[in-house]
């Protein structure tokens, strides 16, 4: 028997909350209470004052040595009594006759009636009390976790425990049901204040603690009536590398078996349970389809022995559910995320990626991400496509025969190199760009600094790049580097490698392996290294026309045989043009100083005239390449674009043509690099001036151009090439010696020229072995008389399209089919020649009709 000091009990009492009842119910309770006390005063025959002790149990009896009667009354509450002897304990307290034992809930009920420390008035209770048809109770618990109890079983337990006891409203009763502590509070006994519990008394629940889940009936349901969600999946073994182990790809049939094992007994709607297999713990959430959630008591359910599958969905990234499996022949990945802060680490290697995927992932799905760890970075790859594709829920098996590739067309900051060891770089060209950090204001209103001329010293640039740009690099590799306190973006625009064993053919490998390696080399970039012997060049981006790079320290090397170099790109060069090309290159090559010392003036302007399509623009562009005029030092423009609607705007555009060359000449003198400007349709910009009847704006443009080209300011680092179909329309002052003094007619090519043009435009087809054996270029040159270079180029393209159309009609297309049925034949060329002739005749006919209309 647990005895406690009353004063300690009183100090530890917690404040009680009084429940709100309606005014009508308050009046009824008051009347019942007065009636109960009146009857009690008339019938009670014995009243005593006793010391009490408190027990820690849920026994609803009050214990005394010699009970006054079967029931006693303390305050407003009536309790059934038992003798101390029934406790089966030996007591030797002389004052035991004057003591009474209460449990904790009984003490809480009567504590307001305690006086003189720990004494209470006890009276015998002999009134006849009617049996209660029902009682309404509240359930509470002291636990901090949820537990489930069955409604009917709990009611039976309460009735069995309180059978024969008298209860009153607001009485608290402690019970321990299935090991769970609960407190019952009587809130209603019908119309009476007091009642007796019998085996037929019905128990109703009013309020239930949230930690007590009272379940209703158990219902048998089939697998189709439930949905299961896999909410969590964790590893129980800390030694495993979870980044590699997850996500787990598992077939739905296997996970169905796990679910059935997990919910093999009764469960409730929205129940959570765990299942462990192979050190992996799965958490499942089961929901009953069509379950009424707006009920006071939950039903319990049990799955029938059903062979149909359960609807299962994974809500965690750690598990991917699949249906069926298939061996993957080809898988293509793309980069889902990137790290822009580490440009030196953005070069990945094809073989490393393939080895990682095949060794770490033996199965994959369409929607799965692959995490590739390199250094301190995590790179995420995702499957772009899988062949053969069944559906998105299929598990694809990866083995050594699976061909792995990567989509390099999707924009990413990563580069995939086909070679593991870097190849020594002979020459690398960097493009310099503005770092583009001006923000929204610059984007909307422009940046004034972008028009200012910025001159870069190539020597200083080279030192800066060698020290700060990654030595190991690839094409399009970029990094932000400071130069003279300003940050610019340097992009690898072009790379020329030294001859390396990696680029040589391997005679020992079979043709199949060689073809596979060739495809990899074509698709992925080449990994190179910048050494002390690497030649470094710089060109500004097209958007940064005001950037001027001083390459005077290392002059551009001009070929000693420029005509032969030019014939690689242009066919049908005339003798007259050969002479001009040699003169141009001689005055800008290694004999430049000797050329000037003899009093010879470098050629400043050339007019190329002739019918359209004869290659005048192409000739000019390739002539600029031979002279080293690339990037910002080569400008191709159209004559009409020079005109501006604002006063003085056209003249300002003329000055802008000559400004870069003049600025470079002022800084470097005769060591300045060569600039080239090609003006197409120059007759629209420099038309003949017609005195007072002319257009004053056009006349002003001509005057400004002549002043810039041949004015007081001397500079010999600019070559200006004008292109026109109508030489006679040009102003006579522009085509005199010292300005555009050289006039070369580019006419339709002769037969020998057409052969060379065909050789140039069929070069790629020959390299790919896509020309049929019956194709004779000499015969093609014969049947294309009066064809311009543009006509021949269009003819080659059209013939190639014809062969592709034949391929497109076939059901199966592979390398063997292309090599057999995809070759460009002589018939394709003749068909293309007829179509071009037809289009030319149609165009001439239309032109004649238009002339007739005007006449």
Curated annotation (Swiss-Prot):
Regions of compositional bias (Low complexity) in chain numbering:
17-27
Tell me the organism's taxonomic lineage: Viruses, Varidnaviria, Bamfordvirae, Nucleocytoviricota, Megaviricetes
Pfam families, per the entry: AAA, AAA_lid_3
Family, according to the entry, reads as follows: Belongs to the AAA ATPase family.
Superkingdom, taxonomy of origin: Viruses
Output the InterPro entries linked to this UniProt entry: AAA+_ATPase, AAA_lid_3, ATPase_AAA_core, P-loop_NTPase, Vesicle-fus_ATPase
GO annotation terms (biological process)? Golgi to plasma membrane protein transport; intra-Golgi vesicle-mediated transport; SNARE complex disassembly
Which residues of the sequence carry a binding annotation for ATP? 610-617
Classification via SUPFAM superfamilies: P-loop containing nucleoside triphosphate hydrolases (SSF52540)
Identify this protein by name: Putative AAA family ATPase R476
Task: Cite the entry's keywords alphabetically.
Answer: ATP-binding, Nucleotide-binding
Enumerate the GO terms in the molecular function aspect: ATP binding; ATP hydrolysis activity
The record's listing under PANTHER family reads: VESICLE-FUSING ATPASE, VESICULAR-FUSION PROTEIN NSF
Q: List the disulfide bonds.
A: none
Q: Where is this region: Disordered?
A: 1-37
Q: Where is the composition biased (Basic and acidic residues)?
A: 1-13
């Amino acid at each position: 028997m647990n005895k406690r000091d009353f004063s300690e009990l009183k100090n530890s009492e917690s404040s009680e909350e009084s429940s709100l009842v309606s005014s009508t119910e308050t009046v009824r309770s008051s009347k019942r209470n007065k009636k109960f006390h009146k009857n009690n005063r008339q019938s009670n025959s014995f009243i005593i004052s006793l010391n009490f002790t408190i027990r820690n149990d849920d026994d609803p009896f009050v214990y005394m040595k010699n009970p006054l009667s079967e029931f006693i009354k303390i305050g407003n509450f009536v309790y059934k009594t038992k003798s101390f002897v029934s406790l089966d304990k030996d007591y030797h307290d002389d004052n035991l006759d004057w003591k009474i034992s209460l449990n904790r809930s009984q003490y809480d009920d009567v504590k307001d009636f305690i006086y003189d420390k720990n004494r209470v008035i006890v009276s015998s209770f002999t009134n006849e009390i009617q049996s209660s048809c029902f009682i309404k109770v509240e359930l509470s618990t002291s636990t901090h976790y949820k537990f489930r109890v069955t409604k009917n079983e709990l009611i039976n337990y309460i009735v069995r425990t309180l059978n024969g006891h008298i209860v009153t409203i607001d009485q608290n009763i402690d019970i321990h049901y299935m090991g769970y502590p609960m407190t019952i509070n009587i809130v209603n006994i019908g119309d009476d204040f007091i009642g007796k519990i019998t085996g037929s008394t019905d128990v109703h629940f009013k309020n239930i603690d949230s930690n007590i889940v009272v379940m209703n009936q158990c219902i048998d349901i089939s697998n189709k009536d439930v949905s299961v969600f896999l909410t969590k999946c964790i590893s129980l073994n800390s030694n495993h590398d979870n980044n590699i182990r997850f996500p787990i790809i598992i077939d739905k049939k296997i996970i169905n078996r796990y679910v059935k094992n997990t919910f093999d007994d009764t469960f409730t709607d929205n129940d959570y349970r765990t299942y462990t297999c192979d050190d992996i713990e799965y958490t499942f959430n089961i929901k009953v389809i069509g379950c009424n959630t707006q009920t006071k008591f939950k039903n319990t359910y049990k799955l029938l022995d059903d062979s149909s599958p359960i609807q299962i969905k994974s809500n965690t990234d750690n598990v991917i559910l699949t249906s069926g499996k298939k061996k993957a022949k080809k898988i293509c990945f793309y980069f889902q995320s990137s790290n822009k802060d580490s440009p030196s680490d953005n070069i990945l290697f094809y073989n490393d990626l393939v080895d990682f995927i095949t060794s770490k992932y033996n199965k994959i799905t369409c929607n799965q991400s692959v995490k590739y760890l390199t250094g301190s970075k995590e790179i995420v790859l995702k499957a772009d496509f899988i062949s053969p594709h069944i559906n998105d829920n299929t598990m694809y098996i990866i083995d050594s025969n699976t061909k792995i590739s990567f989509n390099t067309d999707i924009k990413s900051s990563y580069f995939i190199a086909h070679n593991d060891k870097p190849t020594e770089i002979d020459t690398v060209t960097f493009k310099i760009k503005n770092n583009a950090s001006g923000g929204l204001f610059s984007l909307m209103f422009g940046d004034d600094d972008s028009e200012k001329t910025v001159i870069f010293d190539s020597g200083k640039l080279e030192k800066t790049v060698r020290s700060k740009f990654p030595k190991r690099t690839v094409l399009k590799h970029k990094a932000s580097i400071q130069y003279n306190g300003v940050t610019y973006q340097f992009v690898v625009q072009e790379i020329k490698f030294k001859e390396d064993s990696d680029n040589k053919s391997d005679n020992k490998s079979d043709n199949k392996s060689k073809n596979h390696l060739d495809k990899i080399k074509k698709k992925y970039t080449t990994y190179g290294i910048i050494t002390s012997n690497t030649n470094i060049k710089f060109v500004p981006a097209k958007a940064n026309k005001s950037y001027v790079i001083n390459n005077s320290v290392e002059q551009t090397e001009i070929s000693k045989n420029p005509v032969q170099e030019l014939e690689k790109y242009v066919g049908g060069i005339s003798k007259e043009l050969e002479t001009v090309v040699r003169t141009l290159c001689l005055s800008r090559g290694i004999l430049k100083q000797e050329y000037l010392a003899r009093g010879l003036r470098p050629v400043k302007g050339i007019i190329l005239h002739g019918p359209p399509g004869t290659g005048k623009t192409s000739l000019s562009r390739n002539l600029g390449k031979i002279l080293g005029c690339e990037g910002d030092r080569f400008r191709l423009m159209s004559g009409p674009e020079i005109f501006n609607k604002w006063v003085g705007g056209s003249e300002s555009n003329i000055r802008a043509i000559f400004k870069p060359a003049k600025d470079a000449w002022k800084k470097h003198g005769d060591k300045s690099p060569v600039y080239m400007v090609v003006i197409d349709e120059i007759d629209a910009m420099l038309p003949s001036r017609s005195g007072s009847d002319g257009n004053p704006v056009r006349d002003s443009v001509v005057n400004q151009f002549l002043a810039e080209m041949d004015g007081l300011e001397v500079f010999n680092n600019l070559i200006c090439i004008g292109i026109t179909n109508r030489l006679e329309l040009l102003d006579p002052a522009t085509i005199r010696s010292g300005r555009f003094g050289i006039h070369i007619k580019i006419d339709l090519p002769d037969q020998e020229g057409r052969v060379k043009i065909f050789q140039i435009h069929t070069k790629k087809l020959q390299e790919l072995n896509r020309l049929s054996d019956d194709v004779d270029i000499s015969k093609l040159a014969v049947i294309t008389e009066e064809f311009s270079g543009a006509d021949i180029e269009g003819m080659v393209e059209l013939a190639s399209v014809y062969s592709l159309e034949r391929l497109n009609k076939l059901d199966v297309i592979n390398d063997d089919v292309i090599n057999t049925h995809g070759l460009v034949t002589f018939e394709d060329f003749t068909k293309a020649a007829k179509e071009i002739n037809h289009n030319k005749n149609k165009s001439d006919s239309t032109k004649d009709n238009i002339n007739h209309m005007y006449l």
